[in-house]
Amino acid sequence: EQAYRTRKANCLTFTLLTVALAHESGLQAYGQELDDIVAWRVGDDIVYRFNHVNAGIAIGRSRLTVDVAQELVMSRDPPRPISDQQLVALYYNNRAAELLAGASPAAAAPYMAIALQLAPRYASGWANAGVLHLRQGDPRAAERDYLKALALDPANAGALMNLVALYRNNGDEARRAIYARRLEKVQVKDPYFQFLQAEDNARQGAFAGAVQHYRRAIRLYDGDSRFYVGLARAYRQLGEERHAQRAMNRAAALSRRSAGGRN
């Protein structure tokens, strides 16, 4: 209701509104979740995971996607249909994460509780619950939540990163090393982690390192034009104009292909 009245919405509220309006119009509509996206917020050595969702609408044999942030979200895989209950759970999970990022753990707690009640097997929800407990001064509960997340999803990078930070901060070097190795195995296969590392290198002026990470990202996934745009910028900073132009040509080709797929 607020999103409709103010004409302002994030991806979740926009999707909830779209699905509700489609149902009112007699259309088959559902939420869709995108995995493996660049949608983490890092702060104070803590990782909050934000999921991206959009709306799917079925009209006869046609399947349409309505996405408020299609141009901004990076994802390798197509969206996955989810239930209305899971969609609402994601709303509460993301709202809790937003409040945590704004340093409001007391306000985040009821949203987190509802999210976990609606989706008790959602690993990233438990990882975010761990952040909440840590903000509330309960590292033992945070550890339990992170481990619960990993029991549900052994490759959950957010839970792994937060566990590594937790053990580092409390001086448990043995456990820190165990989970750091697990995290490294996950990250080395993640093109978007490599992309974020490249962006960080570029911001610091370490353009040779940025090139290495952009190229690793591309080896893992060759379908995102933004990898090539970043690579071109880094090459230009190094004075390698021929390589930069080649990267930009590839970025342009991928952008045209993506635009053609949406039309």
Q: Where are the regions a protein language model picked out?
A:
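Hydrophobic/aromatic-rich core segments of domains that either
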Residues: 16-86
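Short coil turns that delineate tetratricopeptide repeat
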Residues: 120, 154, 188-189, 222, ...
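TPR alpha-solenoid repeat register
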Residues: 125, 159, 193, 227, ...
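Single-residue signature of alpha-solenoid repeat helices
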Residues: 108, 142, 175-176, 210, ...
